[in-house]
């Protein structure tokens, strides 16, 4: 069995990597990938904590987090496809300009 500290450290490293990708990247697709990494890191923390205390709640939360991440990814990718068709660019700077 993996110790609690090792699992939580791995989850924290993954969360920081996802946050770094979210903050540094200017492409919306890479920002979405960074957000998915952050969601998976938090789900990993739930699983590690649940297995440490012998409770199935962590696995239930993991299933919930994965289903929410799948819904978020599908909606995000659909919006990105529409944005790419209209602007031919996924740069966050070009998207932030409003018409009107």
From Swiss-Prot:
Q: What is its EC number?
A: 7.1.1.-
- Summary of subunit composition and partner proteins: NDH-1 is composed of 13 different subunits. Subunits NuoA, H, J, K, L, M, N constitute the membrane sector of the complex.
The protein, known as: NADH-quinone oxidoreductase subunit K
What are the subcellular locations of this protein? Cell inner membrane
Q: Which Gene3D superfamilies match?
A: 1.10.287.3510
Q: What is one GO cellular-component annotation here?
A: plasma membrane
Q: Does the keyword Secreted apply?
A: no
Q: Which domain of life is it from?
A: Bacteria
Q: Which organism is it from?
A: Enterobacter sp. (strain 638)
Q: Could you tell me the membrane topology recorded for this protein? A: Multi-pass membrane protein
Q: Give the transmembrane ranges.
A: 4-24, 28-48, 60-80
Keyword terms: Cell inner membrane, Cell membrane, Membrane, NAD, Quinone, Translocase, Transmembrane, Transmembrane helix, Transport, Ubiquinone
Q: Name one GO molecular function term.
A: quinone binding
* Cysteine disulfide partners in this protein: none
* Protein task: NDH-1 shuttles electrons from NADH, via FMN and iron-sulfur (Fe-S) centers, to quinones in the respiratory chain. The immediate electron acceptor for the enzyme in this species is believed to be ubiquinone. Couples the redox reaction to proton translocation (for every two electrons transferred, four hydrogen ions are translocated across the cytoplasmic membrane), and thus conserves the redox energy in a proton gradient.
Q: Which reaction does it catalyse?
A: a quinone + NADH + 5 H(+)(in) = a quinol + NAD(+) + 4 H(+)(out)
Identify its protein family. Belongs to the complex I subunit 4L family.
Which HAMAP family does this UniProt record tie to the protein? NDH1_NuoK
The record's annotation in Pfam families points to: Oxidored_q2
GO BP terms in the entry: ATP synthesis coupled electron transport
EC main group: translocase
């Amino acid at each position: 069995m993996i110790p609690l500290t090792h699992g939580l450290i791995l989850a924290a490293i993954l969360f920081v990597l996802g946050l770094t990708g979210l903050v540094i990247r200017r492409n919306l697709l890479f920002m979405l990938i960074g957000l998915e990494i952050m969601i998976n890191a938090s789900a990993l923390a739930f699983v590690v904590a649940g297995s440490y205390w012998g409770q199935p709640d962590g696995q239930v939360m993991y299933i919930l987090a994965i289903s929410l991440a799948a819904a978020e990814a599908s909606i995000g990718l659909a919006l990105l496809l529409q944005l790419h068709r209209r602007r031919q660019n996924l740069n966050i700077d070009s998207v932030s300009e409003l018409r009107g």
